[in-house]
Amino acid sequence: MAIKHFLQFKDFTREELEYVFERTSWIKNQFKSYQKYWPLSDRTLVMIFEKASTRTRLSFEAGMQQLGGSAIYLNTRDSQLGRGEPVEDAAQVISRMSDIVMIRTFEQEIIERFAANSRVPVINGLTNEYHPCQILADIYTYIEHRGCIQGKTVAWVGDANNMCNTWLQAAEVLDFKVHVSTPPAYEIQPELVGKINPARFKVFADPMDACRGADLVTTDVWTSMGFEAENEERIKAFADWCVDGDMMRVANPQAVFMHCLPAHRGEEVTAEVIDGPQSVVWDEAENRLHVQKALMEYLMLGRIQG
């Protein structure tokens, strides 16, 4: 099997994604039934962090251990990557001592260069541009709660960040629509818009209009990592883009609310919504664990028969 990476959502076909979702359900059921499943015994995951994280580290490290393998944590401050070693050189060495690599960093270019020089699969744990593992978990969570996402409408409210970018890619691959509402100056990046089928998304000035009839309403923090200096300015700019009960009430009555966490109640979402009956954020967070186990299994072992 040729080396397969997961650097952007569109790296996988619809068929591959459906397979990963199917495997996620099976693996999750094994976990919930306390059935040991160790297909990655004696395999090693190296996790490289330039951006700190709770959920990404925990889900990958625990997931690898639950599949029988081991995980090694590296951060750029304590490794040669933080001392100027070329990414290409690091990839050559690290990939000779591991079976799979997950990287959480700032620039997409870094992970692309690493993958180009790696002998093993590379997973994007998050970059400024994309967050494919999170959207994988989000879509799986929607399927668990409401069924197939094809033909549905996702409302994105807030910053057109890596999450928004990845939702747009996912809409292309899995055939659904995204309604996007952002404050002026925080819109979808022009270079990305040109790559997306215009039938897959629509931009709204008013977040209420974006949520109207939506099947899934989602948002993220107003100030992502690396943009802390803009925090006060962003709080003012995003004040009208807080997902509240009124927005959820104009959505489909069966709509669910998602947030990749951590959340700031009273900023991007009200407590009424995130702690309310339509919120599935805790299942969404847990599903990072299970969907990434299925992802790692597929990247290392290919399709499991039977």
Curated annotation (Swiss-Prot):
Annotated carbamoyl phosphate binding sites: 53-56, 80, 104, 131-134, 260-261, 288
Domain of life according to the entry: Bacteria
Main location: cytoplasm
Record pathway: Amino-acid biosynthesis; L-arginine biosynthesis; L-arginine from L-ornithine and carbamoyl phosphate: step 1/3
Residues annotated as binding L-ornithine: 162, 220, 224-225
Record's keyword terms, sorted: Amino-acid biosynthesis, Arginine biosynthesis, Cytoplasm, Transferase
Any one GO BP annotation for this protein: citrulline biosynthetic process
Ribonucleoprotein listed as a keyword: no
GO function terms (MF aspect): amino acid binding; ornithine carbamoyltransferase activity
Catalysis performed (reactions): carbamoyl phosphate + L-ornithine = L-citrulline + phosphate + H(+)
Family per record: Belongs to the aspartate/ornithine carbamoyltransferase superfamily. OTCase family.
Gene: argF
Role description: Reversibly catalyzes the transfer of the carbamoyl group from carbamoyl phosphate (CP) to the N(epsilon) atom of ornithine (ORN) to produce L-citrulline.
PROSITE patterns attached to this UniProt entry: CARBAMOYLTRANSFERASE
Compartments where found: Cytoplasm
Top-tier EC class: transferase
EC number: 2.1.3.3
Higher taxonomy: Bacteria, Pseudomonadati, Pseudomonadota, Betaproteobacteria, Rhodocyclales
Record carries keyword Cell wall biogenesis/degradation: no
Species this chain originates from: Dechloromonas aromatica (strain RCB)
GO cellular component terms given for this protein: cytoplasm
Protein's UniProt name: Ornithine carbamoyltransferase
